[in-house]
Amino acid sequence: SALYTVVWATYSVGFTMVPTLYMNNEISYEHDFNRKMEKVCRAFANSLDQAAVSALEAGKTQILKDKLNYNFAANVIEVPTQMATEIMGDINPIMRANCYPGLVHVVGNAGIDSLIKKLAQHGIYNDVNKRMEYENKVFHYTNNVVNEASKNGTFFAVEDGNVGVLTRVDREALNRT
């Protein structure tokens, strides 16, 4: 394994709660706190998601040892529409050729979610069993992965353990200064 430089980002949030505003009010202090906390959590999760997608975009592979039947240009595998249902099954051999034989995590957008749902319609008791295309992967969906013009779906394939979040609390925050 290689030595990586960890880039830290500081995230901080806050909101105001004034107890006297909730006296004689239909909205309780707890209800308003929970609503505000939910907004903060969603915004924080979206910020982390955007940072993760940016890291995936910046770290795309530049070399494919075996691109199978696909075109590979500008660090992107172009999938023809007629092969859209096959790419999920082909990701494992492509990753294995680049020495990533482990469990694959797929980070995709709504177009990939739609593709997986269409593949799932062809299960074990249907006309064609398409489960092998997608069943040995872990899927994560986000609206922060965007399609290029005239594309139906975009995803990143990452081996398990290659992307993560480290938590570090600044000393000043621990000391409340």
Question: Could you describe each region identified by the protein language model?
Answer:
Residues 79, 117-177:
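Sequence/fold signature of self-assembling virion shell proteins
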Residues 1-100, 112-125:
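Flexible, glycine/threonine- and acidic-rich loop/arm segments that mediate assembly and lattice contacts
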